[in-house]
């Protein structure tokens, strides 16, 4: 759903976009917030629990001081590039987005290295010690994320999986940090990655293939948390079609 001029003016009780200072669009099923580019006076905006996948529209809100984006679909921390030019930004809530990955520490350090003026991140005060550590432990973001297309809709699955795919390629098991650092959040959402005991013992010959397959499965299960009912239905249909195709191949093999 696109955030429209009418929606903004109604919620902000304003007559013109350029005069809007505070806006609350919590849980509005939004995917497109491009109209934010027309709100230069915006200071506080709440966009939590939506389906927003890019931060580019708020890059022109030079007076923005508080940005709430919990539980959206921001795919990569590279999106933080669009916030680097906001001199007044002091409060950011970005938790429960795909970009947070499986390492809370790495995520927090990267955000603080990119946005050192923050005073509060994900409802936790930022300390001087954290800012110092972020210089060496956080990743440096120097360019805007590459995009396939110009829309502001949902991200491609390959982009959302980028960090987890990297872990799979390097042999790093996302189950390690996910089970230890974010089990509480997963309990709340009613979903956990598969435990090691759920996978059967395999020979050394199959170990590498099994490890990669487990990482892919874990990534998929983690991403399911971010989908709404419509998205889950699409996944269900795709899985059903895939299962039907595989069963057809098995029948053909047996016939031969």
Swiss-Prot record:
Tissues in which the UniProt entry reports expression: Widely expressed. Expressed in the retina.
Chain ranges of the LRRCT domain: 97-137
LRR repeats: 19-40, 41-62, 63-84
Keyword check for Ribosomal protein: no
Keyword Ribosomal protein: no
Single biological process term from Gene Ontology: cytoskeleton organization
Alphabetized PROSITE patterns for the sequence: LRR
Region (Disordered): 129-156, 168-212
Compartments, as annotated in UniProt: Mitochondrion; Cytoplasm, Cytoskeleton, Cilium basal body; Cell projection, Cilium, Photoreceptor outer segment; Cytoplasm
Entry-annotated residues carrying Phosphoserine: 136, 177
Effect of residue 224 to P: In SMDAX; abolishes interaction with NEK1
Domain of life: Eukaryota
Primary location group: mitochondrion
Outcome recorded upon mutating residue 107 to H: In SMDAX; increases protein degradation; changes protein localization
GO cellular component: ciliary basal body; cytoplasm; cytosol; Golgi apparatus; mitochondrion; nucleoplasm; photoreceptor connecting cilium; photoreceptor outer segment
InterPro entries, alphabetized: Leu-rich_rpt, LRR_dom_sf, U2A'_phosphoprotein32A_C
Keywords: Cell projection, Ciliopathy, Cilium biogenesis/degradation, Cytoplasm, Cytoskeleton, Disease variant, DNA damage, Dwarfism, Leucine-rich repeat, Mitochondrion, Phosphoprotein, Repeat
Signal sequence, start to end: none
Subunit structure as annotated in this protein's UniProt entry: Found in a complex with CFAP410, NEK1 and SPATA7. Interacts with NEK1.
Functional note: Plays a role in cilia formation and/or maintenance. Plays a role in the regulation of cell morphology and cytoskeletal organization. Involved in DNA damage repair.
Pathology linked to this chain's protein: Retinal dystrophy with or without macular staphyloma: An ocular disorder characterized by decreased vision which worsen over time, and dystrophic changes in the retina, such as retinal pigment epithelium mottling and vessel narrowing. Macular staphyloma, without high myopia, is present in some patients.
Protein name: Cilia- and flagella-associated protein 410
Species this protein is from: Homo sapiens (Human)
């Amino acid at each position: 759903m696109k955030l429209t001029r009418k929606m903004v003016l109604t919620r902000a009780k304003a007559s013109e976009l350029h005069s809007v200072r505070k806006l609350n669009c919590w849980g509005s099923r939004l995917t497109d917030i491009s109209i934010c580019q027309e709100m230069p006076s915006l200071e506080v905006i709440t966009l939590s629990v939506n389906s927003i996948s890019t931060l580019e529209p708020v890059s022109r809100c030079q007076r923005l001081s508080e940005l709430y984006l919990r539980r959206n679909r921001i795919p990569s921390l590279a999106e933080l590039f669009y916030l680097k030019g906001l001199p007044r930004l002091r409060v950011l809530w970005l938790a429960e987005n795909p970009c947070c990955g499986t390492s809370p520490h790495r995520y927090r350090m990267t955000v603080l290295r990119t946005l050192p003026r923050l005073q509060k991140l994900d409802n936790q005060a930022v300390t001087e010690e954290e800012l110092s550590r972020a210089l060496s432990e956080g990743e440096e973001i120097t360019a805007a994320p590459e995009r396939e297309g110009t829309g502001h809709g949902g991200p491609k699955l390959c982009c959302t999986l980028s960090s987890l795919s990297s872990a799979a390629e390097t042999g790093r098991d996302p189950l390690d940090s996910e089970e230890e650092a974010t089990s509480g959040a997963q309990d709340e959402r009613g979903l956990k990655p598969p435990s090691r005991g759920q996978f059967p013992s395999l020979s050394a010959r199959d170990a590498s293939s099994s490890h990669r397959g487990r990482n892919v499965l874990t990534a998929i299960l983690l991403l399911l948390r971010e989908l709404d009912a419509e998205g889950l239905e699409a996944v269900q249909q795709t899985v059903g079609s895939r299962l039907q195709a595989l069963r057809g191949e098995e029948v053909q093999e047996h016939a031969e």
